[in-house]
Amino acid sequence: MKVRDLTLLFIAGGKSSRFGGEPKMLSKIGPNEETLFEMSIGQMMNRIHIVQIHVVVNKENKDKIMEEVKRVNQKHEICKNITFNIQEIPEFRSKPWGTADAVSSAKEHIHTPFLLLNSDDLYDSKTFQFIGEQCDLSKNYIIGFTLGSTLSGNQKANRAFISVDKEEKVIELQEKLNIERDYYSNHQLENQYVSVNLLLLQPSVLSSMDHELNEFKSQHIEDATAEALLPNFLNSLMKQDILSMELFKTSGQWNGVTYKDDVQSVREAFLSPRKEN
């Protein structure tokens, strides 16, 4: 069944503290100074049918981000439905609650199957082509990249390790924090699949997650550092048989921006003759 009518849900509510506070999705990484967001949209165009672009933002970055989203949408005539919501930060916290909160906060705006994406990541046109050709719109998928394709140099990163049964149904996600490439063997780098927050989900998942999130917040109401990590909440829904997900393996190349130094390496990846945009 070929995927049709997908909403894009971009997470962009973070503070970008390791990036000087500027929205990473506005980094100019394309051969003609295109932003990361425009390059991301370019990877999806003609591979999936986009009916809505929704962005989770914060109060500080809202205007800059939405200006770029609208500009790119108008330039490429992508869709008529551009929406956003602000991920609120309680007074007792300096940062948002986390990725699960960002995703859940969009629940009032998402009414069709959607692709969840990090706004500062690029997932490769090949990945979206396979999603468009092979994914069943009625199911939930986590798109897995090999561990090695998502780790570079000696920079630390967080990755959700994916465990599946013999039918490729996801049975557990294990979030590992501050890992480096050197921690793992070549076999693990080539064969362990991880999530970098690219998922195809049904809108009902958002309501289920919101219920879990409310409980989490009530338990950590005085903890300014507690973080609602998306893999943990997906795990909880799977254990309760509320959510069933399949692993969709991609051989696409992931690129992401966390630090200022990453901008140049991502730009070089797109300028490489081997790179398909």
Language-model features and meaning:
Residues 124-204:
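Conserved core of the sugar-phosphate nucleotidyltransferase
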Residues 18, 64-65, 126, 233, ...:
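Phosphate- and divalent-cation-binding pockets in alpha/beta enzyme and binding domains
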Residues 8-10, 55, 116, 142-143, ...:
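Structural beta-sheet core signal
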Residues 2-4, 173-277:
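Conserved alpha/beta core of the MobA/IspD/sugar-nucleotide pyrophosphorylase nucleotidyltransferase superfamily
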Residues 60-84:
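Acidic donor-binding segment of Leloir-type glycosyltransferases
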Residues 26, 161-164, 247:
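A structural signal for short hydrophobic beta-strand segments in well-ordered beta-sheet cores
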Residues 2-68, 91:
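N-terminal glycine-rich phosphate-binding loop and ensuing alpha1 helix
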Residues 79-161:
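Conserved beta-loop-beta/alpha segment of the NTase-like Rossmann-fold superfamily
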